[in-house]
Amino acid sequence: MNPEQSPLGKATVYAAQYDASLLFPIPRAGAREQLGITSALPFFGTDIWNAYELSWLNARGKPQVAIATFYVPAESPNIVESKSFKLYLGSFAQSKFDSVDAVRDVLKRDVSAACGASVSVQLVSAHDFRKLEMDELDGLSLDRLDLDADVYEPDPSLLSAADGEDEAPVEETLVSDLLRSNCPVTGQPDWGSVQIHYVGPQIDHAGLLRYIISFRNHTGFHEQCVERIFLDIMRACKPVKLAVYARYTRRGGLDINPFRTNYNQPMPDNARTARQ
């Protein structure tokens, strides 16, 4: 299936009852081939989806609400198109389930089937909402730099790193809130924050910020943009270790937060940023 066949940008009919067939998978392979990935993945990681508009009926017909988090492995063959995900979650609203566990089991089964890999699902019920945290991405802000920018399509030539053999490798965590890309189907802007942690030659901060800004007119799904950022930094700056984590603002009750790395480390924190 390709994005043009998805529900994006089309008139919407909301399902009256639970319907797993609403999920619309999109293969990752096409976008990855455009990035030069044709065999083994040069990274691993997770796409963290948070769903804020999930509701269903209990066995007695009383509405229940929860926030759902889905952990989709980067090696899954498919992603789920976001509007189809919204419509699928909306189909729970007038359907009865015996328990929260029953809802979680159905979500895990259906989304795993659509993605082609095992997806972890967590549900936070209303009485636990106050436990949810909000925080900003840790790291040195690139946005502090006062600079000119005039490139608004991804340009890896903006990236550079120290090349002296005598230069000791550095370890840095850098962040920016200036990431913007655009939906490849509707053209709607997607706003995000990005965190880049690396070990290796010192990356030029001004060039990295200009590179992040260069996504401003780019069309691509969230996951594809993060993978492109990861690969461009690896190729241009040659770090020994690299991790890229983006948190995008929500649309349609969903936010998507892709994480890619080439070394083992804990799962990134799923705390919402202020803009989410």
UniProtKB/Swiss-Prot annotation:
It catalyses: 7-aminomethyl-7-carbaguanine + 2 NADP(+) = 7-cyano-7-deazaguanine + 2 NADPH + 3 H(+). Substrate binds at residues 80-82, 222-223. GO terms for molecular function: preQ1 synthase activity. It is found in: Cytoplasm. Pathway: tRNA modification; tRNA-queuosine biosynthesis. Its EC number is 1.7.1.13. One of its GO terms (cellular component) is cytoplasm. Gene3D superfamilies: 3.30.1130.10. Coiled coil: none annotated. One of its GO terms (biological process) is queuosine biosynthetic process. The keyword Disulfide bond does not apply. InterPro entries: GTP-CH-I_C/QueF, NADPH_dep_7-cyano-7-deazaG_red, QueF, QueF_N, QueF_type2. NADPH binds at residues 82-83, 251-252. Signal peptide: none annotated. Catalyzes the NADPH-dependent reduction of 7-cyano-7-deazaguanine (preQ0) to 7-aminomethyl-7-deazaguanine (preQ1). Homodimer. This is NADPH-dependent 7-cyano-7-deazaguanine reductase. It comes from Burkholderia cenocepacia (strain ATCC BAA-245 / DSM 16553 / LMG 16656 / NCTC 13227 / J2315 / CF5610) (Burkholderia cepacia (strain J2315)).
